């Protein structure tokens, strides 16, 4: 079962929840990065938060290049989860606590995301662990949310370690268990990691990436 219907519904509920609760769209600090998501005027020199809406991509993002580079077939949901929309990261409440789902802010962000997924998959190969790819974070314990590439199930994973707990048998069922979390935008601190400079790859993931690299 594709995750796309569940993602469509969650993103639609997300901006509707902000409108009904706060009377405004969700806001995000783009840090000078343009996006089709931005509603209203955008000044690249400004450090102010912008209002945004998820936008369906005209040309769907593909991970065929990642599959070719790693000689690996990726679970099809990766193309639906990351390739259908331009959007800011989205916050959620869930049975497993609060967290954040990554999304793609613009085409450059998509390129950076692909490089980070390649890095993650290469690390899994080096550690002789089953392939996973990340979709977000749980706030408690800085734990990644990952998809098992063999069967599409969703797990909690600490970088460098085996996934520790299955959260849902599929990405669709995981997303269906989430509800939008209403919160003010947070301006993420940029860490000196060139491959992770795009704001769509959130600061908390960068901290975990440092931990992962330290275990090489």
Swiss-Prot record:
Localisation: Cell inner membrane
Source organism of the structure: Shewanella sp. (strain ANA-3)
Gene3D superfamilies: Syd protein
Name this polypeptide is given: Protein Syd
CDD domains per UniProt: Syd
Family the UniProt entry places it in: Belongs to the Syd family.
Recorded GO CC terms: cytoplasmic side of plasma membrane
General function of this protein: Interacts with the SecY protein in vivo. May bind preferentially to an uncomplexed state of SecY, thus functioning either as a chelating agent for excess SecY in the cell or as a regulatory factor that negatively controls the translocase function.
UniProt keyword annotations, A-Z: Cell inner membrane, Cell membrane, Membrane
Source organism superkingdom: Bacteria
Any single Pfam family the record assigns to this protein: Syd
Topology versus the membrane: Peripheral membrane protein
Principal location: membrane
């Amino acid at each position: 079962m594709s995750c796309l219907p569940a993602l469509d519904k969650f993103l639609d509920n997300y901006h509707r929840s902000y409108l009904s609760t706060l009377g405004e769209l969700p806001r995000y600090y783009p840090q000078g990065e343009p996006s089709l998501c931005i509603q209203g005027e955008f000044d690249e020199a400004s450090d102010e938060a912008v209002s945004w809406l998820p936008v369906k991509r005209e040309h769907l993002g593909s991970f065929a290049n990642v599959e070719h580079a790693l000689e690996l077939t990726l679970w099809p949901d990766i193309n639906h989860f990351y390739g259908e929309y331009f959007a800011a990261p989205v916050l959620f409440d869930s049975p497993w606590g609060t967290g954040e789902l990554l999304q793609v802010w613009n085409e450059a962000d998509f390129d950076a995301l692909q490089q980070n997924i390649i890095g993650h998959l290469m690390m899994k190969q080096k550690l002789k662990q089953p392939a996973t790819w990340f979709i977000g974070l749980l706030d408690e314990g800085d734990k990644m949310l990952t998809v098992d590439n063999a069967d599409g199930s969703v797990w909690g994973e600490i970088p460098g370690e085996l996934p520790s707990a299955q959260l849902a048998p599929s990405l669709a069922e995981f997303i269906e268990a989430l509800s939008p979390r209403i919160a003010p935008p947070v301006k993420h601190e940029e860490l000196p990691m060139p491959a992770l400079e795009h704001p769509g790859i959130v600061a908390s993931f960068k901290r975990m990436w440092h931990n992962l690299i330290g275990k090489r």
